[in-house]
């Protein structure tokens, strides 16, 4: 049994993630936890899965506090007062998906060993429902958003800039515009009404999905556009010219803003060489893709900052959870005295290509075997996550997605990155034929 991917349990509603599964997760979690805080993003299936997992927790004798519709970082921050946190979300995935992500009191997602413990309990159905008079209590707390907001405002400086915030009809709508206004920003909202159908755009805040935000930034003369995903753990930006800032650029800018020389920065294997060169004297450590793996390494080596080019930024001084609301506030600090386009120009840039090839989950293992046999002849191989081949002029990474039926390709080189990408793409397509 393999329930947990790189970002918790996630799948299509009522097919891969069901109320029966959620009930069992609650029963398994309740075996060792006496208190849990539970939140959800706006997804249509959110309340259904929430009720099921709460039923399991209560049946195991665990007390539950519901905090309603909140962002994932809000839930993670609230977990400090409980034994664990449960977030019902599928993050950036489309509306038909739903998921469950579990959190520790320090804001760290459940690690591999904790996930395996839950999986083993479910597989063996080794549950321990309590007697009728020991069933857990359920209550509600409306203060989680306020507490998260106050924490952010205590850790950022004021800003007078004009910002357009596109929450993608996600959970960030409940907090981000308010935080930015309290900072002193002039805030214009876009797609900032929670709607689990995500009618305005795909929840993932990538370049393709942010066309309206780019137009709005230029039309309203904004200093910046900020976009979040369905649960606001991810955040990306548009500069004042309406240009998308890539994840590698964002990570490099945050590192420069937050860190001193000699800093330790943790990134996944698909991160650009730009980050290594953006902060001279720093140490860049690469991990498996997935914010939980980045967070684990940040904690292990006491790193200064970390993140993923997909839009997850981790500031360990405040939490080990990627926080798209805190990152939104931090980037306003960053552009207070200089434009985002000016800061972007100062970064070293290398041609980078990213893409995906559709691949059914059951065929991924075969495809990766073929990729390994072909690419091992091309350079030094690392298999920390997928297959990364380093060459004199650059590198290419082939990695199966942990949440979707896709294989991801990343290629970067000082020259010829497109050829590296095409080579890997062709190998995958040949293996699928």
Swiss-Prot record:
Catalysed reactions listed for this entry: alpha-D-glucosamine 1-phosphate = D-glucosamine 6-phosphate
Cofactor(s) demanded: Mg(2+)
Cofactor note: Binds 1 Mg(2+) ion per subunit.
Pfam families per record: PGM_PMM_I, PGM_PMM_II, PGM_PMM_III, PGM_PMM_IV
One MF term in the entry's GO annotations: magnesium ion binding
Active-site residues, Swiss-Prot/TrEMBL: 91
Highest taxon of source: Archaea
Record's keyword terms, sorted: Isomerase, Magnesium, Metal-binding, Phosphoprotein
A GO BP entry: carbohydrate metabolic process
Phosphoserine, modified sites: 91
Class of the enzyme per the UniProt entry, highest EC level: isomerase
CDD domains: PGM_like1
Record's comment on post-translational modification: Activated by phosphorylation.
Residues the entry annotates as binding Mg(2+): 91, 229, 231, 233
E.C. no: 5.4.2.10
Family: Belongs to the phosphohexose mutase family.
Listed HAMAP family: GlmM_A
Known role: Catalyzes the conversion of glucosamine-6-phosphate to glucosamine-1-phosphate.
Official protein name in the record: Probable phosphoglucosamine mutase
Organism listed in the record: Methanococcoides burtonii (strain DSM 6242 / NBRC 107633 / OCM 468 / ACE-M)
Gene: glmM
């Amino acid at each position: 049994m393999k329930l947990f991917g790189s970002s918790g349990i996630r799948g299509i509603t009522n097919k891969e993630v069901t109320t029966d599964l959620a009930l069992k997760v609650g029963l398994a979690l309740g075996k060792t936890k006496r208190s849990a805080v539970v939140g959800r993003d706006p997804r249509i299936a959110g309340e259904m899965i929430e009720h099921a997992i709460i039923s399991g927790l209560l049946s195991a004798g665990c007390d539950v506090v519901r905090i309603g519709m909140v962002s994932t970082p809000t839930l993670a921050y609230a977990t400090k007062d409980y034994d664990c946190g449960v977030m019902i979300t599928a993050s950036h995935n489309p509306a038909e998906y739903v998921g469950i992500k579990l959190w520790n009191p320090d804001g760290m997602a459940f690690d591999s060993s904790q996930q395996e413990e839950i999986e083993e309990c479910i597989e063996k159905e080794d549950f321990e429902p309590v007697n009728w008079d020991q069933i857990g209590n359920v209550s509600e707390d409306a203060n989680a958003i306020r507490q998260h907001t106050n924490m952010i405002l205590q850790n950022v400086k004021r800003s007078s800039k004009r910002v357009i915030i596109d929450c993608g009809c996600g959970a960030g709508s409940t907090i981000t515009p308010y935080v930015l206004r309290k900072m002193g920003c002039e805030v214009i909202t876009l797609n900032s009404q929670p709607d689990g159908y995500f009618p305005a755009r795909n929840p993932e805040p990538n370049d393709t999905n942010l066309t309206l935000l780019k137009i709005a930034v230029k039309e309203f003369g904004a200093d910046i556009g900020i976009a979040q995903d369905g649960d606001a753990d991810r955040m990306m930006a548009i500069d004042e010219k309406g240009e998308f800032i890539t994840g590698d650029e964002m990570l490099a800018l945050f590192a420069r803003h937050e860190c001193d020389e000699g800093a330790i920065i943790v990134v996944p294997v698909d991160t650009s060489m730009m980050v290594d060169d953006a902060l001279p004297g720093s140490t860049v450590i690469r991990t498996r893709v997935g914010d939980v793996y980045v967070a684990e390494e940040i904690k292990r080596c006491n790193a200064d900052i970390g993140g993923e080019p997909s839009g997850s930024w981790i500031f360990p001084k405040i939490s080990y959870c990627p926080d798209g609301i805190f990152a939104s506030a931090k980037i306003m600090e960053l552009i207070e005295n200089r434009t985002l386009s000016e800061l972007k120009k100062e970064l070293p840039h290398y041609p980078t290509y990213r893409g995906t090839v559709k691949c059914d989950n059951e065929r991924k293992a075969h495809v990766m075997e073929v990729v390994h046999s072909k690419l091992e002849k091309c350079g030094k191989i690392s298999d920390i996550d997928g297959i990364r081949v380093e060459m004199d002029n650059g590198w290419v990474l082939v990695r199966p997605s942990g949440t979707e039926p896709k294989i991801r390709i990343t290629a970067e080189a000082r020259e010829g990155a497109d050829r590296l990408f095409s080579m890997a793409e062709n190998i995958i397509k040949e293996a699928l034929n």
